[in-house]
């Protein structure tokens, strides 16, 4: 029944006003006859962004980062969008970068990574590009107050960041953008002042938990920052989400899901009419951020199960007008890969030192074609490319 209903759906134009990102004057597209044409602007629909038209842009997808700033930089440099001189400059020109969630937990530089992506987005827009994020299950868990997977040093970063905000007279935007350039010094200062007994300091740890709660509870400054991003994003005819989009999500409404998650994140919970955590997006094995339906190894499935998953995937893609879906969430021991006729791409390689500590890999998309970019196993500065149709 779900597939019949899905086949009757059309990807209707979003109702939200459009935002235009104008390419820089130097952004030119070379045609087959040697002429150069100016790129069309990027058009964003939805709040948070849900549907993006990025004509003739190169798209790069990066998987789960889990608080590892070093690996995040490696991945972004591998993607060709981050400078390698330590200045954290955007060098991707008009590239569109999409990070598919799970920046939080398991590492100690979470806010620094979020700050880096915001800084790169500002720089990218000036060059006709853009940076997008979708929230993962670890973002929604933290806004819910579930800190089970937080690295002890990440609590310290939250404490430092709250103290740092005082230097900016609570000017959030300026402080947040600059944290990537300041966080290293704060981290070094903290390390130099620590003693062996600090790890057993209950008061210090409690202070970190309180700082994290202040920042990430619904309505908190960092929760509001996360609310700028949805859990589902379509760029051209490519769909991005953390766990996986399913037929009942499409029937419920993609924009509606994004809007409800965003509203929940930015709304304080101390009111009777405060919005509840959107279950369809954030809770349960079949929610947008938790689903692993498309990420299981097909070798573990029976033929009839593979057929079922394949039908669910392609019905979903047809309903939203997408060629393929890109997901994170489940580390892929074989690296970035595709299944079901390359209708699904799995880009979480467990690169964070808090997960598998594997070498970064990224997915590059040009038009309807995608390829995996990975570093050479022996020499990091050499790149290997695996092409897919």
Curated annotation (Swiss-Prot):
Induction: Circadian-regulated, with a peak in expression at 8 hours light time on a 12 hours light/dark cycle (at protein level). Induced by heat shock. Down-regulated by infection with the bacterial pathogen P.syringae. Residues 1-53 form a transit peptide. Expressed in rosettes leaves, shoots and flowers (at protein level). InterPro entries: Calcineurin-like_PHP_ApaH (IPR004843), Metallo-depent_PP-like (IPR029052), MPP_Shelphs (IPR041787). GO terms for molecular function: manganese ion binding; phosphatase activity; phosphoprotein phosphatase activity. The active site is at residue 138. Its EC number is 3.1.-.-. Disruption phenotype: No visible phenotype under normal growth conditions. Keywords: Chloroplast, Hydrolase, Manganese, Metal-binding, Plastid, Protein phosphatase, Transit peptide. Binds 2 manganese ions per subunit. Gene3D superfamilies: 3.60.21.10. Its cofactor is Mn(2+). GO terms for cellular component: chloroplast. Mn(2+) 2 binds at residues 102, 137, 242, 314. Mn(2+) 1 binds at residues 64, 66, 102. It is found in: Plastid, Chloroplast. Belongs to the metallophosphoesterase superfamily. SLP family. Shows phosphatase activity, hydrolyzing the artificial substrate para-nitrophenylphosphate (pNPP) in vitro. This is Shewanella-like protein phosphatase 1. It comes from Arabidopsis thaliana (Mouse-ear cress).
């Amino acid at each position: 029944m779900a597939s019949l209903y899905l086949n009757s759906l059309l990807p209707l134009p979003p109702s939200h006003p459009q935002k235009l990102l104008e390419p820089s004057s130097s952004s030119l597209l070379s045609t087959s006859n040697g002429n150069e044409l100016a790129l069309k602007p990027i058009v964003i629909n939805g709040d948070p962004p849900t549907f993006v038209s990025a004509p003739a842009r190169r798209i790069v997808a990066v998987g789960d980062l889990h608080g590892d700033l070093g690996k995040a930089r490696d991945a972004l440099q591998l993607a060709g969008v981050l400078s390698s001189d330590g200045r954290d400059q955007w060098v991707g020109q008009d590239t569109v970068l999409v990070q598919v969630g799970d920046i939080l937990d398991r590492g100690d530089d979470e806010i620094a990574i979020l700050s880096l992506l915001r800084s790169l987005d500002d720089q990218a827009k000036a060059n006709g590009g853009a940076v997008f994020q979708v929230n993962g299950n670890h973002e929604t868990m933290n806004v819910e107050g579930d800190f089970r997977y937080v690295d002890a040093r990440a609590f310290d970063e939250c404490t430092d960041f709250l103290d740092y905000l005082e230097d900016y007279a609570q000017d959030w935007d300026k402080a947040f953008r600059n944290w990537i350039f300041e966080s290293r010094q704060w981290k070094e200062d903290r390390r130099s002042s620590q003693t062996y007994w600090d790890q057993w300091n209950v008061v210090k740890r409690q202070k970190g938990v309180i700082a994290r709660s202040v920042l990430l509870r619904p309505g908190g400054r960092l929760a509001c920052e996360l609310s700028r991003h949805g859990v589902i994003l379509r760029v051209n005819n490519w769909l991005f989400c953390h766990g996986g989009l399913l037929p009942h999500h499409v029937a419920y409404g993609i924009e509606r899901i994004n809007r409800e998650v965003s509203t929940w994140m930015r709304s304080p919970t101390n009111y009777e009419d405060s919005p509840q955590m959107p279950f369809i997006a954030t809770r349960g094995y079949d929610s947008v951020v938790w689903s692993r339906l498309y990420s299981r190894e097909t070798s573990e499935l029976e033929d009839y199960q593979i057929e079922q998953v394949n039908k669910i995937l392609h019905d979903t893609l047809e309903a939203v007008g997408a060629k393929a879906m890109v997901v994170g969430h489940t580390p892929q021991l074989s690296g970035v890969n595709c299944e079901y006729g390359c209708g699904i791409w799995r880009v979480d390689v467990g690169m964070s030192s808090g997960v598998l500590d594997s070498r970064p890999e990224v997915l590059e998309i040009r038009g309807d074609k995608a390829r995996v970019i990975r570093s050479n196993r022996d020499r990091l500065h050499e790149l290997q490319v695996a092409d897919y149709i």
